[in-house]
Amino acid sequence: CALPICPHVSVVMNFTKPTAEKPALLTLGEVETFLHEFGHSLHGMFANTRFESLSGTNVWWDFVELPSQFMENYAVEKDFLRTFAFHYETGEPLPDNLIERIVKSRNFMTAYACLRQVSFGLLDMAYYTKKDAFTEDIIPFEKEAWKKAMIFPQLPDTCMTVQFSHIMAGGYAAGYYSYKWAEVLDADAFSVFKKNGIFDQATAQSFRDNILSKGGTEHPMTLYKRFRGQEPTIDALLERNEIKRNVESK
């Protein structure tokens, strides 16, 4: 049949229930979760491909979280919050200084958190790029893999590998880096919206046409560069996380 098939997409959430005194009020975390899942749903709703197996979220593993994490950026954008974030009794909008404090608190120790995720990705790749059978002591192997990203000394008699279920039984073998890579992509993509306006229709249409509608029909970097005009850099992520780059090592 040549007729297009419209997708059926649902977002199923577990929100805080109302009480006798208060209606159901969303926490910031619930708003972020909704936006995240809504990003996945947009990927499916805007799909325009011939084959279902290449539509929507059926993309490369390290590209699937771009639309979802991209949408999370709106959760702390003042212009977005002004469209709905009002006190349920007084109608008072969410104060700007409160939003700023939330952002500041989220960025506490963010550089350490970043390197922690990078270290996990390095360990993952160290295991899955090893050509010979593993016959070594695990702890020295971990330290060698982590030496580029380790800030604090490892506690004696601790071992990450034995609890690293993501790469052993969770489907992230040789793919744990995709968590941090998705952050690089979503921050870089959202920087275009920050520049042009977070509700700019032309920018949104380009994101839809070049990324959301294409699914897995082309290489992710081809799609991304078509939208962005260049490959992603880490600059937007560092700026969002308020991490100062060492100019000498740039």
Language-model regions, residue ranges each:
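Cation-handling catalytic/transport regions enriched in His/Asp/Glu
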Residues: 2-250
